[in-house]
Amino acid sequence: MKELGVFDNTIFHVSDEPTIYNADTYQKALQMVEPYLEGAKIIDALSHLDLYEKGIVKNPVPTNDSIHQFLDAGLKNGWVYYCCGQGYKVSNRYIAMPGWRTRILGAQLYKYKMEGFLHWGYNFYNCQYSLHTIDPYRINDGEDAFPAGDPFIVYPGADGKPVESMRLPVMEDAMNDMRLLEYLESLTSREHVLDLIDDYGNLDLRFDEYPSGCDYLQDLWETAAKEVEELIK
């Protein structure tokens, strides 16, 4: 990978959601691969704080319903993720969720300076353990394994190219919200943008607390975009 020039942009992971109960085997697995990954970044999805506090997982990727525990413990510029288990209070992209609940992620990523966002299900068209394939146009939950829409965000096209779901453009909106806020920060200050996010909605935006409905996000976008337009004239 170094010869190809992609090593610095490659991220490795050892185990999905290790816990204190399998910490010994996680550490053994980590020790097996570490000699071959010198200088590489290793991240692992994590829901429980203890392995991070003990220094066993140095670069955790917390779920968005546990992220505030990690932030309170000092996590800086980390990653965050959601998947099939994050269906209460927090953002996700299930088929049954309204678009604003999916889109709020962008403002959250900006406010908490998340370095990355992780999700597993781009085009998983199998049953839970990949014993056989499924037709995602008819079966959208991996045969009762996941919330509908969790395993994929695009559909297979007849020509082998992905077909957008209705949720994919909403995820793009979320990322564009984040990019707009970052750009406005470059023209003003981080404090100004944070005031815009929180004071405009009269709230303290969190991953588990955010305005319901489309108005907040639409107003935030229009206000930020108008300020950018005025500043770059």
Q: Which residues does each PLM region occupy?
A:
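Catalytic-core regions of glycoside hydrolase
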Residues: 1-130
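Catalytic domains of carbohydrate-active enzymes that cleave complex glycans
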Residues: 1-26, 31-47, 130-233
